Amino acid sequence: MESNRVLLVVDGVRMNNAIYRKGHLQNSITVSPTQLERTEIVFGPSSVIYGSDALGGVIHYYTKKPKTAEEETIKSGFLSRFGTVNQEVTTSISTELSFKKWASYSSISYSSFGDLQMGKKRSHGFLDWGLVPNYSKNVGTNYYANQTINSDPTIQRNTGYNQTDVLQKFYLPLSKKTDLNVNLQYSSSSNIPRFDKLSELKSGMLKFAEWYYGPQKRFLAATQLSINPEKKWLEKGTFTIAYQNIKESRVQRKFGSLEKLFRNEEVDVYSVNGDFTVPLTKDKNRDLSYGFEVAYNDVTSVSEGKIINVINNNVVGYSGDFKVQSRFPDGGSSYLSTAVYVDYRQDLNKKSTLNTGIRLTDTRLEAKWVDQTFLTLPQDQINIKNSALTLTFGYVYKPTKNWQINSVISSGFRSPNLDDVGKVREK
């Protein structure tokens, strides 16, 4: 399974949103590896704890966290990396401030990737397989009416891009049993060419002069309150409030045409999570976990077409706006998910652990088309309501310190999102 059948999570906040598609995604690159503390992978259906989209498993990214110290401490880090295979240059700078009552972690990372190059040893015997004989030089303001011969067919032209990632975290211990974490993340890329489309042929010639994803931008602001009352009814718990803003766009133009098509999407995601643990025995060999999640997605999809103005092989501007079919309903869309869950764990003995849980999820999707120039629909609105009750039963056996055997029986589900029911045209 891939894409919207696998759930991506960063610091306890789900990254999957209403427009995650079933094709290949590049959203994971918006979390810089230089800012990661660890990554956890959960295989198989995990819908009881994580909800919809966790059919194929969960990938949970944990970014680096600041820590307090009895004495004032300042730590700085610098990383620089260069790769010859695609002329990669990555630079990362970080600073951690540790004080008695608060701490901060700041990091900025920049990466630049050149065109990919394939190996020249072709032991499989297909001498021409994968080679790129021609490519489009229509990059930036350059205009070329025809395709260009590739001087080195082993280089996949128009595959390079760059991106910047910023991470800012604050940690404030409000009391011995209460902590506050503030998490700010921002990621932005350059235009990202779509190589498969730029290699597509029509009558033996390249079809597209331009086809690229516009700058992919992700902003996250999250606040997490951790409590440790150590009571019989509640040992510990966390409240997480988060806001995300995601911007994507697709731009394309065919050879032999001056018409350039722009499609832009923006998603605002508001979410609230609560996760709590209750010990059922003094030795804590049995505990009960429970929680809730509310997530609301607001989607805006707009599109337009423009005629490029060309002078001496340079694009000097645009004129003659025309209508283009939007990727998603142009009247706006929303996706609401609410859920509650209960999970029970018991250590049967020193080597065996039993785990079982149940989750109830309700999802609601609404969308509306306004402009029906290209589409004539029997209904101009979509209203979908789904609910699901999922169960899980797991058993863990540890025969030795170095071995662990896991078994699980679980039901999973995935509620259709806007990409499933409201997308028009290409992926």
Predicted feature residues:
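N-terminal periplasmic accessory domains that precede
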Residues: 8-9, 25-29, 41, 54-77, ...
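Transmembrane beta-barrel wall of Gram-negative outer-membrane proteins
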Residues: 86-112, 123-190, 217-219, 282-283, ...
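Face-selective signature of the C-terminal outer-membrane beta-barrel domain
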Residues: 173-187, 215-372, 387-388, 392-404, ...
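Short acidic/polar hinge/loop motifs at secondary-structure boundaries
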Residues: 14-45
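Extracytoplasmic beta-strand/coil segments of soluble accessory domains associated
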Residues: 1-14
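Flexible, surface-exposed loop regions and adjacent strand-edge segments
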Residues: 121-130, 136, 187, 196-207, ...
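Extracytoplasmic loops and strand-loop junctions of Gram-negative outer membrane beta-barrel proteins
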Residues: 41-42, 74-77, 125, 148-154, ...
